[in-house]
């Protein structure tokens, strides 16, 4: 057993030596090949690579439709640098003749832009000068000249023969007066003034004196009965049931007498109607400004004397 163990332990170094000898005789180890291929860069070389920047762009100018766009060499530089970075190669530099040819269209475009700006300034100055010519000297001299602007249209000279006599319309509506009382006789002034009908709830509720009497004395019931019983459309007895001049006077009065037995407030209608007429006359006398005379002569008011106008030229 001990002999076998010794023989087994001794076989391992033999295998290792045989394996090492096989490596030396055959191909080399790939680890050694990797270490040989990797080159260690110094700090100066790294700084030099980072400092050299070949990607530059010039000022961009909008090309005109007549001109061809200038070639951009910077894009070529960029693509070459991207492909050359893993191989640590620097892109080829352009020759001075190529740089000069690429800058030529750029200078042409800049000159055309500058000439266009000059033409635009010329047109703006010419337009402003034309506007000042149209506005005149009053607007060109600033706010001080605005005081001399004419704000009133000058009137033409008046001649003595152009003055016409005043017509009836020029005299006014209140020019015709009564000869007896001296008050105006126009329709507006002589119209009778009725009692106010919207004197309740700050002139918002319509309540006339006639309606108060009709509802207070139950005459509204009589008017409704006459309205439904009348066959003639032209018969307005329902509006004036106590009228003596309209048709069916006896029939209406007899019907109201029978209804007064059941509605005794109907006996107060005639006295209330008389009081209403009296109040109406008093109110009209106080508030009517015109004439109340029945038969009077009308006199036209004299036009007040006006001093003669001065027809001389204004200074």
Curated annotation (Swiss-Prot):
Biased composition (Polar residues): 1-19
Disulphides: none
Main localization, broad class: cytoplasm
Gene Ontology molecular-function annotations: molecular function inhibitor activity; protein kinase binding; protein serine/threonine kinase activator activity; protein serine/threonine kinase inhibitor activity; ubiquitin-protein transferase inhibitor activity
Keywords: Cell membrane, Cell projection, Cytoplasm, Cytoskeleton, Developmental protein, Membrane, Microtubule
Keyword rRNA-binding attached: no
Region (Required for interaction with CAV1): 117-315
Annotated region described as Disordered, given as residue ranges: 1-39, 51-141
Family annotation (InterPro entries): Sprouty, Sprouty_domain
Entry comment on modification after translation: Cleaved at Pro-143 by the prolyl endopeptidase FAP (seprase) activity (in vitro).
Site (Cleavage) residue list: 143-144
Residue ranges, compositional bias (Low complexity): 107-130
GO BP, sorted A to Z: branching morphogenesis of an epithelial tube; bud elongation involved in lung branching; cell fate commitment; cellular response to leukemia inhibitory factor; cellular response to vascular endothelial growth factor stimulus; ERK1 and ERK2 cascade; establishment of mitotic spindle orientation; fibroblast growth factor receptor signaling pathway
GO cellular component, one term: cytoskeleton
Tissues of expression: Expressed in the testes and brain (at protein level). In adult, highly expressed in the lung, heart and at lower levels in skeletal muscle and kidney.
Start-end of Basic and acidic residues biased regions: 20-32
Span of domain SPR: 177-291
Keyword Iron attached: no
Subcellular location: Cytoplasm, Cytoskeleton; Cell projection, Ruffle membrane
Assembly with partners or alone: Forms heterodimers with SPRY1. Forms a tripartite complex containing GAB1, METTL13 and SPRY2. Within the complex interacts with METTL13. Interacts with RAF1. Interacts (via C-terminus) with TESK1 (via C-terminus); the interaction disrupts SPRY2 interaction with GRB2, potentially via disruption of SPRY2 serine dephosphorylation. Interacts with PPP2R1A/PP2A-A and PPP2CA/PP2A-C; the interaction with PPP2CA/PP2A-C is inhibited by interaction with TESK1, possibly by vesicular sequestration of SPRY2.
Function: Antagonist of fibroblast growth factor (FGF) pathways via inhibition of FGF-mediated phosphorylation of ERK1/2. Thereby acts as an antagonist of FGF-induced retinal lens fiber differentiation, may inhibit limb bud outgrowth and may negatively modulate respiratory organogenesis. Inhibits TGFB-induced epithelial-to-mesenchymal transition in retinal lens epithelial cells. Inhibits CBL/C-CBL-mediated EGFR ubiquitination.
Similarity field: Belongs to the sprouty family.
Protein name in UniProt: Protein sprouty homolog 2
Annotated source species: Mus musculus
High-level lineage: Eukaryota, Metazoa, Chordata, Craniata, Vertebrata
Gene behind the chain: Spry2
């Amino acid at each position: 057993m001990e002999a076998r163990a010794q023989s087994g332990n001794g076989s391992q170094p033999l295998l290792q030596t045989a394996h090492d000898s096989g490596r030396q005789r055959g191909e080399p180890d790939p680890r050694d090949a990797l270490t040989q291929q990797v080159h260690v860069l110094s700090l100066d070389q790294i700084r030099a690579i980072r400092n050299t920047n070949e990607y530059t762009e010039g000022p961009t100018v909008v090309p005109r439709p007549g001109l061809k766009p200038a070639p951009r060499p910077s894009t070529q530089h960029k693509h070459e640098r991207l492909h050359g970075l893993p191989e640590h190669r620097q892109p080829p530099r352009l020759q001075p003749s190529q740089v000069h040819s690429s800058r030529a269209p750029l200078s042409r475009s800049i000159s055309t832009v500058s000439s266009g700006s000059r033409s635009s300034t010329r047109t703006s100055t010419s337009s402003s000068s034309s506007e000042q010519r149209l506005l005149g000297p009053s607007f060109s001299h600033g706010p001080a000249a605005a005081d001399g602007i004419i704000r009133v249209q000058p009137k033409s000279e008046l001649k003595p023969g152009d003055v016409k006599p005043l017509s009836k319309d020029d005299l006014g509506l209140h020019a015709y007066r009564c000869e007896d009382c001296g008050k105006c006789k126009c329709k507006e002034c002589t119209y009778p003034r009725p009692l106010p009908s919207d004197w309740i709830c700050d002139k918002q509720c319509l309540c006339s004196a006639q309606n108060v009497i009709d509802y207070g004395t139950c005459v509204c019931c009589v008017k409704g009965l006459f309205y439904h019983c009348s066959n003639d459309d032209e018969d307005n007895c329902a509006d004036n049931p106590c009228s003596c001049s309209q048709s069916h006077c006896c029939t209406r009065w007899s019907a109201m007498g029978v209804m007064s037995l059941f509605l005794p407030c109907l006996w107060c209608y005639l006295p209330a109607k008389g009081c209403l007429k009296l109040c109406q006359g008093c109110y009209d006398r106080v508030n009517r400004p015109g004439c109340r005379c029945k038969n009077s002569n009308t006199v036209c008011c004299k036009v007040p004397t006006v001093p003669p106008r001065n027809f001389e030229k204004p200074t």
